Amino acid sequence: MRHDLADFPKIYDDVYRFVDLVKETISNKEKSRAFFKSLNKKDLEQYRDKKHGPYITFDIGCDSDVTLDNQITEHSNYPGHIIDIINQVAEIPEAMLSFATKSTELDTFVRHVKNPKMCRIRLSLMLEWQRQILELNTAKIIDRIEAINKLVNAGFEVHINLSPIVITKSFVKDYGDLLSLLNEKLNEKAKAQLAYEIIFLTHSEKLFDFVQQFAPKAHQMMVNNQFPLEPKPNKENVLSYSPEDKKTYKQIMETLIKKHTPYARIRYMF
């Protein structure tokens, strides 16, 4: 089970003070060291999920791409503050870190992370033609796929984050082609440890309006009369696909994964 850092208020009495500390942690080397040293075995034990095995996993890459954050502080004598944090956590036997990235510029991580098996990298993948509309100026999907082999060979655990899943008329062919490409390009070592995290498109109403104004092509893709977004039950100002559409396409995705990458498991899908 993965936990966001902000899910650990019991370590500190004031959850907001804790969140503020975490924000400072990823921007201040000395405070990050003090923070992770404060996480003793007793703190970690209360969050253990036996289904997850021996480790408690801290997610440090939900709101931003930390590989890019790392580049800001990287210089000739210092590999960057995110790598520094990863190496600190590796000293805690019960803890590991995880983050998602769209970047393929990961050589610094390969060279300087001391214990890569204690770091799970989630490579974000989507359809290439959708990337060219929704994620301009990010790494090509084929390059991200090829990066998986390199990271696994270096000792990292690498999962695939399929996100955002945008439902279109060509869904079955498009994702069949993507998963077939994965099967073709991944080496056996990468396949043996592969797992998926799958997230269907979800939008806040404010962000939806912003995209409509400043990214009309992306908005046009998301506004699909056949698969409309609608307010999510019990979630104020959140838009998603209807429960019926999502149920149908989750089943289709499961079938495609079993067909093209039967060795991979699905960690979660929503």
Regions found by a protein language model. Give the residues of each.
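Auxiliary Fe-S-binding modules of radical SAM enzymes
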Residues: 183-270
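Catalytic cores of alpha/beta
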Residues: 170-185
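Structural preference for beta-strand elements that scaffold enzyme active sites
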Residues: 55-59, 96-98, 118-122, 157-161, ...
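Aromatic/hydrophobic pocket-lining residues that form the small-molecule binding cavity
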Residues: 82, 141-144, 175, 246, ...
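Conserved Radical SAM active-site core
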Residues: 1-122
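A conserved active-site cap/scaffold subdomain adjacent to cofactor or substrate pockets
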Residues: 152-158, 162, 169
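Conserved radical SAM core fold
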Residues: 60-70, 103-108, 119-138, 164-169, ...
